[in-house]
Amino acid sequence: MKSILVGAAVALVVSILFTPYLIRVFSRQGFGQEIREEVQQSHAAKRGTPTMGGVAILVAMWAGYLVAHLTVTDEPPTASGLLVLGLTTALGIVGFLDDFIKIRKQRNLGLNKTAKLVGQLVASVLFAVLAMQFANQNGITPASEHLSFIRDITVISFGSVGFVIFAYIAISGWSNAVNFTDGMDGLAGGTAAMVLAIYVVISFWQFRNNCSAPNGPALACYTVRDPLDIALVAGAAMAACVGFLWWNAAPAKIFMGDTGSLALGGLLAGLSMVTRTELLMIIIGGLFVVEALSVVMQIVVFRSTRRRLFRMAPFHHHFELAGWAETTVIIRFWVLAAISAMFGLGLFYADWLSLAREFF
């Protein structure tokens, strides 16, 4: 537990202190955000606000993780922790390239769809292949070929190739979902912090009730490799998001950009796979799912009927164009995100209770 607290504290401090440094550097370099034409009127004042703030989140997350390992725990970094951090960083690099092209070309279009998908594909395949390696002494690998809800669903197995395909779909889906949500000051960062806080609790609970515990399996135990290190990653990332939110809250002094949104989406996907909660993540990160679905529904309905289902997609812009103040949309969406996240945590705990009762 001490390692989680130290990692989170370091990440929080680094994020709060490093972000204003990036604001000054990016402002001098002219690394300002371009605004979508559809929202130019309401977001015109945001044009030129420094972007690529996701760099601060990544640096803070890594700093928290490494300092905790160097100062608190005698254990080296684990395969699960490094794989999730590596996936997060790889997608952050894809997002950084996307942001950089937008800035250089002075438009709101960066990498083309093919280049972005290829970047996500490479990161996803590397993660999926490596996550099926590095079995511990009990034969448990960071990820599993089985689909999972709160635990592996043993009757549903993807196989090696199928898991790689599934991982790509999950990682690209979550990274794009967070990217869609990042359209208002602090919306994606605040929501991600809530989801990550839930994953600190989940992974620490899995550590306390692990099937590979030195003193023998706990009641209703979890077959997860490196749960304590996963909790450290989630805690450092959560604190990094909170520190960044200090500067990203409305009115934002900096945006996370695709650097941050793609990285955080990859982080959520990676956490869901290494904790065996892939389907539960859909509930915990429900706001991200709704935002992504609103884009899909808008496209499908428009192509079918030539009419728009929403005033504008993603969903948060629909309410903004309906006359809601931006801060009102953000706070109400945060409330919905918190409800969804807590409901997911409740399902996780209810599953443990139902299985634990069988032993009494």
Swiss-Prot record:
Record flagged with keyword Kinase: no
EC number, UniProt record: 2.7.8.13
GO biological process: cell division; cell wall organization; peptidoglycan biosynthetic process; regulation of cell shape
GO-annotated cellular components: plasma membrane
Topological category with respect to the lipid bilayer: Multi-pass membrane protein
Keyword Repeat found: no
Catalytic activity: UDP-N-acetyl-alpha-D-muramoyl-L-alanyl-gamma-D-glutamyl-meso-2,6-diaminopimeloyl-D-alanyl-D-alanine + di-trans,octa-cis-undecaprenyl phosphate = di-trans,octa-cis-undecaprenyl diphospho-N-acetyl-alpha-D-muramoyl-L-alanyl-D-glutamyl-meso-2,6-diaminopimeloyl-D-alanyl-D-alanine + UMP
Keywords tagged on the record: Cell cycle, Cell division, Cell membrane, Cell shape, Cell wall biogenesis/degradation, Magnesium, Membrane, Metal-binding, Peptidoglycan synthesis, Transferase, Transmembrane, Transmembrane helix
Predominant localisation class: membrane
GO terms for MF: metal ion binding; phospho-N-acetylmuramoyl-pentapeptide-transferase activity; UDP-N-acetylmuramoyl-L-alanyl-D-glutamyl-meso-2,6-diaminopimelyl-D-alanyl-D-alanine:undecaprenyl-phosphate transferase activity
Main EC class the enzyme belongs to: transferase
Localization of this protein: Cell membrane
One Pfam family named in its UniProt record: Glycos_transf_4
Required cofactor names: Mg(2+)
Pathway linked to the protein: Cell wall biogenesis; peptidoglycan biosynthesis
Function: Catalyzes the initial step of the lipid cycle reactions in the biosynthesis of the cell wall peptidoglycan: transfers peptidoglycan precursor phospho-MurNAc-pentapeptide from UDP-MurNAc-pentapeptide onto the lipid carrier undecaprenyl phosphate, yielding undecaprenyl-pyrophosphoryl-MurNAc-pentapeptide, known as lipid I.
Family matches, as PANTHER family: PHOSPHO-N-ACETYLMURAMOYL-PENTAPEPTIDE-TRANSFERASE, PHOSPHO-N-ACETYLMURAMOYL-PENTAPEPTIDE-TRANSFERASE HOMOLOG
Family as reported in the entry's similarity comment: Belongs to the glycosyltransferase 4 family. MraY subfamily.
Identification of the protein by name: Phospho-N-acetylmuramoyl-pentapeptide-transferase
Protein encoded by which gene: mraY
